[in-house]
Amino acid sequence: EDVLGNQAPFDFDVSVKDLYSAFKTGATLVLIPRRMFSVVTELLDYLCEHRVTTLIWAVSALCLVAQFRGFTYKVPESVNKVLFSGEQMPAKFLSQWQHYLPKASFVNLYGPTEITCNCTYHVLSRERSYSGGLPIGKPFPNERVFLLDSENREITAPDVPGEICVAGSALALGYYRNPEQNQAHFVQNPLNDRYPETIYRTGDLGKYAESGELFFCGRKDFQIKHMGHRIELE
């Protein structure tokens, strides 16, 4: 039986994945006390004691364990699935997790809050070096992800940056009482002139590799991510 270890507080969108994944599958969900993410030894004790199998964590939480060399204290060997999102995963910390959990699956997730947390995923292969970075993967069911240039033309060629746009059933209705942001981000699909179809313009930039895989490559504005939180530098 799967046991999910909840990392995100309930006012953070990542918690939705823990809650509804557990409800949908009948898995057990354990609520890890917040203070334990400041005391890595206690956190690892908790994961081992509750035999947690699945982690759907922000990258910053995984980095915390690796930075403080937590696995030299204890390895939660019951963990067999690690899914992460929020920002780009540093290769040196990812390799540490993979080294100490050799049988676990690792999944890179991508997506903003506005499309219900995630819209793409990539299951990592242990036989691949990922020297060019981690792809953000392919869309989840009922989602479409594509790139638009500055003139609203779709980009399909490799190595050409464009804005990542999302369509599908998981889009939010919009921002609460913020019509200016709604007009900028929740817009009619410029590729569809046949019927109304709202897309979300993420403000993130992506590009395709020669393999056809999609990679995140920055922002079109001055927003950054730090420890999973959006920060506007303007």
Regions found by a protein language model. Give the residues of each.
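Conserved AMP-binding
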Residues: 8-12, 35, 113, 168
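Conserved structural elements of the adenylate-forming
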Residues: 1-7, 140, 145
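Conserved AMP-binding/adenylation subdomain of ANL enzymes
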Residues: 1-5, 13-53, 126
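Short, well-ordered beta-strand segments
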Residues: 3-5, 11, 17, 30, ...
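Residue-level signal for well-ordered alpha-helical positions
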Residues: 35, 68-69, 96, 178, ...
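Gly/Ser/Thr-rich phosphate-binding loop
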Residues: 19, 23-27, 52-56, 66-135, ...
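AMP-dependent adenylate-forming
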Residues: 63, 99-108, 120-234
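Short secondary-structure boundary segments
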Residues: 59-60
